Amino acid sequence: MAVIKRALISVSDKTGILEFAKALAEFGVEILSTGGTAKLFRDNGIPVTEVSDYTGFPEMLDGRVKTLHPKIHGGLLGRRDLPEHVTAMQAAGIPDIDMIVVNLYPFEATVARPDATLEDAIENIDIGGPAMVRSAAKNWQDVAVLTDASQYEEVLAEMRSTGGATSKATRFALSVAAFNRISNYDGAISDYLSSFNADGTRNEFPGQINGRLVKVQDLRYGENPHQQAAFYRDLYPAPGSLVTAQQLQGKELSYNNIADADAAWECVKSFDSTACVIVKHANPCGVALGATPLEAYQKAFQTDPTSAFGGIIAFNHTLDGAAAEAVSKQFVEVLIAPDYTEEALAVFKAKANVRVLKIALPVGGDSPWSRGRNSHDTKRVGSGVLIQTADNHEISAADIKVVTKKQPTPEQLEDLLFAWRVAKYVKSNAIVFCGNGMTLGVGAGQMSRVDSTRIAAIKAQNAGLSLQGSAVASDAFFPFRDGVDVLAEAGASCVIQPGGSIRDDEVIAAADEHGLVMIFTNIRHFRH
């Protein structure tokens, strides 16, 4: 145990710092501080010594040089167990500093502002703070280093139980957290500055990217039992994203549960109307809109009852008791909704293994992050990473082009836009038959588009669903007319696709021959 006798506190985020400093003062700890933090302490009656008075060297360069002094870093780096260190410090008049409490200039928050300039960013690069944190973290055997307000109460609790001391285990854990914070901070600076070109313009893909992830949990195993796995989140997760989920009940989430739950949640939250999405192996096997969650679920389940067994079910509106009763009649791995009524939760209490997740819907805004979406997607390849801007493109009726002689009715257009939205979340090659606000057949992941079309039609037939008058979405263009021939024979009346094939004329002619409506979006939604 190391008793805390002297602490240096210098924070930008002053959350909880008054209470923490008062508690230290009650232990008889001498408090050193700088600038605004010192003023805050004085104004609240907490005894404090300004760092400039302690070092005998004034702050200079608009506060850029405050703590970069041998009396500070010597007090942090000197090892108490080495006689030569102790002798040197005594000769130089350098006392020990047993604790520092430092959080850094808000660089990340500054550059996150849309109006932030390069000058703003530079002025928010902390120098003295990280230097002190590194010194203290290196000498964790003797010094406790706190870098976040969330650490205050735990440290105080230990000090209260030990008469004002911290344990070696606590100091080591604080040291690791401190180095993680410095790494993340420097990574954010590197990422931001690397994104600038020589002429001052920004580059979407900087010369170096520093991955900054935080472990959420270890997993029992990976995609298969022989693989090890863990779940990590972004340092600053988007509101309404899967990692913000609260698990209300059920077994621990598996690797596959998480992957499938993300696919279901991303799809369902793209709808404004009440919707239900059922996912199996990261592919939607049933999607529907309804006046109520119950109606949406019943319609989604009709698409493919066989595949829905053991699936992931997601809703974008509060799940009520009626919908919960219906869902509870089938085997479900994970259930997701923004909220649940008390009646719904009571239903699932009898199904203790069902993993019930609650995720608040994103607040919305101009950026993908504010809408709960990734701004970029990554994919690992051999010793490398592919990075692309995320596929967050959405279309409306104003963005489409009718390329056939026949024009869509309002009802057809509504079904086509619904089908197009679903197809975006189906693995390529993707074909989706829809009608009346629900999927009727889904063909996913085939190497040829015509095979996906045939499979989607067979799925509908197996489920006893008629495709007469249905709408079809294809995530990419039809390379030949054969896919159009198959969907027309199945009963479709209209189709939406990107267009762009060298055989577009042939494909459009086939649609005209069958009396179909065909719409081009000029946007492709490959998903691999």
Curated annotation (Swiss-Prot):
One of its GO terms (molecular function) is IMP cyclohydrolase activity. It catalyses: (6R)-10-formyltetrahydrofolate + 5-amino-1-(5-phospho-beta-D-ribosyl)imidazole-4-carboxamide = 5-formamido-1-(5-phospho-D-ribosyl)imidazole-4-carboxamide + (6S)-5,6,7,8-tetrahydrofolate; IMP + H2O = 5-formamido-1-(5-phospho-D-ribosyl)imidazole-4-carboxamide. GO terms for cellular component: cytosol. It holds the Pfam family MGS. It comes from the Bacteria. PROSITE patterns: MGS. Keywords: Hydrolase, Multifunctional enzyme, Purine biosynthesis, Transferase. Residues 1-147 form the MGS-like domain. GO terms for biological process: 'de novo' IMP biosynthetic process. InterPro entries: AICAR_Tfase_dup_dom_sf, Cytidine_deaminase-like, MGS-like_dom, MGS-like_dom_sf, PurH-like. Pathway: Purine metabolism; IMP biosynthesis via de novo pathway; 5-formamido-1-(5-phospho-D-ribosyl)imidazole-4-carboxamide from 5-amino-1-(5-phospho-D-ribosyl)imidazole-4-carboxamide (10-formyl THF route): step 1/1; Purine metabolism; IMP biosynthesis via de novo pathway; IMP from 5-formamido-1-(5-phospho-D-ribosyl)imidazole-4-carboxamide: step 1/1. Its EC number is 2.1.2.3, 3.5.4.10. NCBIfam families: PRK00881.1, purH. HAMAP family: PurH. Belongs to the PurH family. The IMP cyclohydrolase activity resides in the N-terminal region. This is Bifunctional purine biosynthesis protein PurH. It comes from Methylobacillus flagellatus (strain ATCC 51484 / DSM 6875 / VKM B-1610 / KT). The gene is purH.
